[in-house]
């Protein structure tokens, strides 16, 4: 991290320690935005810095208007009463293939059905868990703007197996039910695993938690033709199954949609909404698409990362020479309107084999050997300028809105970036109901590290990118070329600098500096 100047205030030292703890997220899943507030007048105008060749590109238009003209309203406090369902087959760390059907009632009770599958398209159900309990919504989250914190109590868990093979496996794993000893489990029957009334709990072997209910965000999307889509985001699941029970969410899973107000093209929504534990949803079979990275890919929405970090991503892949370029735009707000910093990275990649661990996934190895950073607000400029030594570009030379190459200094110590860097990635592709190609890459490790060994390769995915251009421009961007900007701001690693302020609050409340 480097030592602070002797006259650096002790509090600023805490900021640096806090920022270093969170800024270690590198490469494809890079980074996060930040919580540090800033006046919009301090942000550099993105349009004035936009590269000419990107002005009219479809990718730029997509990144400039992620909502595609729709009006999005976040409701606080969140009224989550209703029936909420998955929009597709979800992949959780492990991996686990799952669909969800959650009902929340006016009296604070909930009934959650989690359907588990043998395959990555959710066509072969193996068992269903029915979880009943109570939830109480608390204050607005201080980690993620627009989110609400919640507390929950599980009162009842029931399991239903959908094959004899699964019944035998679960029966051996749990070795008890609340009805007393069972000789053997049978498919199609419900087995009580937890009962608040009797004090029985046979569910520990499932490693089940509903900590996702500790963080919620409700959005209403008003589309052009008057249709309203309601989306409920629940807290993320830790990538390490051994940490799942203790994890308090700081980002989100894929959104659930209201069973009455979902996207009209959502086939999975309709199937899941009318399913139950005795008749689990079976989604339409689909073929796995071969992962073809060639072209340009961009974020579909303002993405949320752990600790309330926000960003947009734009990747360019060159299949002819297996090189890649990445633009990361970081923000301090969940609408991606207040920029903090941007980062440009490039390197090489190698195409691997089909994953033996994650059905439908393909393994890649990515190397990053070139990086440029552009601070987009004053706090980050100060953060970058205060470090001793030429370990993050030229010492003391950072200016607002001016890009600097950090390759010669082997990255940027201030931001926790080391070059060269290697990551072991997981990808999959699919086509949505509108015919668009979507690209998923591996979820970042929940402990804040990077997947720099094969053993740390992801078993689940981040939010998808959409192909916005089938071909890619020839060659890398050379020194002196403008970083493409997007209206509303551009930010990658800068948001992490702002996150330092939020983490400072944590440090000051948890331990002395």
Can you say where each PLM-predicted feature lies in the sequence?
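Preference for solvent-exposed, low-hydrophobicity sequence contexts
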Residues: 6, 26-29, 499, 504
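N-terminal glycine/threonine-rich, aromatic-flanked beta-hairpin/loop signature
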Residues: 46-50, 55, 65-76, 80-83, ...
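N-terminal signal peptide
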Residues: 22-61, 67-76, 288, 483-486, ...
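Short, hydrophobic/proline-enriched secondary-structure or compact coil segments at domain edges
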Residues: 111-113, 150-152, 225-241, 322-327, ...
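C-terminal GPI-anchoring signal of eukaryotic secretory precursors
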Residues: 470-500
